[in-house]
Amino acid sequence: MDASTLFKKVKVKRVLGSLEQQIDDITTDSRTAREGSIFVASVGYTVDSHKFCQSVADQGCKLVVVNKEQSLSANVTQVVVPDTLRVASILAHTLFDYPSHQLVTFGVTGTNGKTSIATMIHLIQRKLQKNSAYLGTNGFQINETKTKGANTTPETVSLTKKIKEAVDAGAESMTLEVSSHGLVLGRLRGVEFDVAIFSNLTQDHLDFHGTMEAYGHAKSLLFSQLGEDLSKEKYVVLNNDDSFSEYLRTVTPYEVFSYGIDEEAQFMAENIQESLQGVSFDFVTPFGTYQVKSPYVGKFNISNIMAAMIAVWSKGTSLETIIKAVENLEPVEGRLEVLDPSLPIDLIIDYAHTADGMNKLIDAVQPFVKQKLIFLVGMAGERDLTKTPEMGRVACRADYVIFTPDNPANDDPKMLTAELAKGATHQNYIEFDDRAEGIKHAIDIAEPGDTVVLASKGREPYQIMPGHIKVPHRDDLIGLEAAYKKFGGGPVGQ
């Protein structure tokens, strides 16, 4: 596309150079800039990428978007705008022909449950023989092909490229986990959502948002930014068991479908049966009651299942068809995942990293604990420490507790575990400043019949260490290796 055509959509302050050049790519990553691409510089939290403008020029890039004039070679065109990342979003969607308009787009937000609901929607679509894509905490996936991702919600240009990739691969729908950070930072500008889903709102990320009010407002942006065009078939799916849903109803003009277990809703779960092999329940709907069976464990996953089913149903698939698909869904990686059922202990990993998430996790497993419940939890570095003692208190619902760091970054691991220990309600706990050693200890003290829960990381494949260096780490592999060494079995797979 000709750059002059591309920039007709943008109000610019000044153009230094010529826009008469062909553009086939846009990037905010200086390492990928080249001839034919636009490099968009921005001022980030730790890096101002304007300093890389000459480097991208040396790589052949002839057009940069900046917030103030740079000292560059004369053959490099500079487009000066007030908000470079907002412009990046407009340019990306224009250049790639508004890819989110070309498929059904589901957006899932909430403190807990985003990954599970989004993955369930994707897996249901696949069981229905529909081409589907997923983007979120567990990476990027088109049908069964997976790639890793850095953030739950990538920056705006990368996000647009992922949607374009899904469209080019023939995806009929795409499900995105929508983080509060991504909403506030404008990473989702220009994405046309067809269905917006809310799971819950509990304390988290106050290091970024400051207050629960600001955090809630951030989540609400997904719904308020659906637009006002009532000729479009857009829908909202809300959890009536969370009171924040009442507010979300007021910020969107589109039809709302509610679900709940404890509070009255249009879609409800009754006669719930739970085991470590899954759940079953009566799905009470405006159209009748259906029996639902699922391999997912825990009452909270019933809420997630209902949200996913309603979202897919809202776009035209019958409930009967969806319910059949749900019976045979694969596990959501790292979410109440039972590792190797042949072991004499129940070894479980989960991503729960808030007090609310931990409470729900313990509620789910406690009825099936045959002997002791051993619970390991970590606290992340450079995060909101006001939630930490409450996490320690909840962890002490278990018989024995292990406190570790989780992505300590530049914080002292001993300080993080001490903050968790402040909430301890009994003395049956131990602190480890090395998470891997904490996991090995959990297995070492476990006896046949015990349940060992490794919480807060799921299958996250790294630890963030000082200098924000990512060091390879897998709770599941460390736990399994220790369990096989003690009890026999294996080998550990990748």
Curated annotation (Swiss-Prot):
Residues given in the record as ATP binding sites: 110-116
Signal peptide, first to last residue: none
Location of the motif L-lysine recognition motif: 406-409
Keywords tagged on the record: ATP-binding, Cell cycle, Cell division, Cell shape, Cell wall biogenesis/degradation, Cytoplasm, Ligase, Nucleotide-binding, Peptidoglycan synthesis
Name recorded for this polypeptide: UDP-N-acetylmuramoyl-L-alanyl-D-glutamate--L-lysine ligase
Name of the coding gene: murE
A UniProt-annotated Pfam family: Mur_ligase_M
UniProt similarity note: Belongs to the MurCDEF family. MurE subfamily.
Pathway involvement of the protein, from the record: Cell wall biogenesis; peptidoglycan biosynthesis
This enzyme's EC code(s): 6.3.2.7
Modified how: Carboxylation is probably crucial for Mg(2+) binding and, consequently, for the gamma-phosphate positioning of ATP.
Function of the molecule: Catalyzes the addition of L-lysine to the nucleotide precursor UDP-N-acetylmuramoyl-L-alanyl-D-glutamate (UMAG) in the biosynthesis of bacterial cell-wall peptidoglycan.
One Gene Ontology molecular-function label: UDP-N-acetylmuramoyl-L-alanyl-D-glutamate-L-lysine ligase activity
Catalytic activity: UDP-N-acetyl-alpha-D-muramoyl-L-alanyl-D-glutamate + L-lysine + ATP = UDP-N-acetyl-alpha-D-muramoyl-L-alanyl-gamma-D-glutamyl-L-lysine + ADP + phosphate + H(+)
HAMAP family from the UniProt entry: MurE
Modified residues (N6-carboxylysine): 219
GO biological process per UniProt: cell division; cell wall organization; peptidoglycan biosynthetic process; regulation of cell shape
Compartments in which it is found: Cytoplasm
